[in-house]
């Protein structure tokens, strides 16, 4: 009987915990911290030279893989590159095909100058995987910004690495699983600029009666 009462008590506690609503996370000035992070985030294209340390990148990735995803399939794989030699070699290949980019005085590498790059691949056998990867990417970007780390989401480098034979060799070295295709890249780094907000078209959102 005592064991039964104990079990009931545990079940009640678990039930209460599972129904506990999310608590509002506020900054010191009383603002909602999550909303502040979303509304102040900007794409960064100028970075300080040092790579993001791996402990911090692990936190960013932990946030990423906790994104909502269809039937918890987690149909993504990520490779993080912070080796400047690899980034430089890929950039050299990119400049062979895009020599005009070298004329830009702000150009440092093909990942919008970021010193750390996350390569995200999706499971092509699962129809919802591109959406899931997008949700993961947003979690990564926002968590990074909340820690003072800038980012830029990129599709061009992914296309280049799949289409250029020499760059594709680097992609193969990343060892993505069968049926996984490089979908996008995210550059991360400590910002060396403070971009201004760009206008957003609120008229694209309509409430239906």
Language-model features, listed with the residues they occupy:
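Acidic, surface-exposed loops and disordered segments
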Residues: 6, 14, 18-209
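Bacterial N-terminal signal peptides that target proteins for export
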Residues: 1-8
């Amino acid at each position: 009987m005592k064991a039964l009462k104990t079990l009931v008590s545990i079940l009640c506690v678990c039930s209460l915990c599972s129904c506990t609503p999310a608590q509002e996370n506020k900054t010191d000035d009383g603002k909602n911290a999550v909303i502040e992070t979303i509304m102040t985030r900007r794409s960064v294209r100028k970075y300080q030279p040092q790579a993001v340390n791996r402990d911090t990148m692990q936190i960013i990735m932990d946030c990423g893989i906790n994104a909502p995803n269809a039937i918890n399939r987690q149909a993504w794989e990520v490779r993080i590159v912070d080796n400047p030699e690899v980034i430089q070699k890929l950039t050299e290949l990119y400049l062979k095909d895009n020599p005009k980019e070298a004329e830009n005085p702000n150009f440092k590498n093909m990942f919008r100058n970021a010193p750390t790059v996350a390569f995200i691949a999706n499971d092509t056998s699962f129809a919802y995987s591109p959406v899931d990867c997008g949700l993961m990417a947003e979690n990564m970007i926002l968590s990074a910004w909340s820690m003072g780390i800038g980012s830029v989401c990129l599709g061009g480098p992914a296309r280049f690495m799949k289409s250029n034979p020499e760059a594709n060799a680097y992609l193969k070295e990343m060892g993505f699983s069968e049926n996984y295709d490089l979908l996008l890249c995210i550059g991360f780094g400590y910002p060396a600029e403070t971009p201004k907000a760009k206008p957003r078209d609120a008229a694209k959102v309509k409430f239906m009666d």
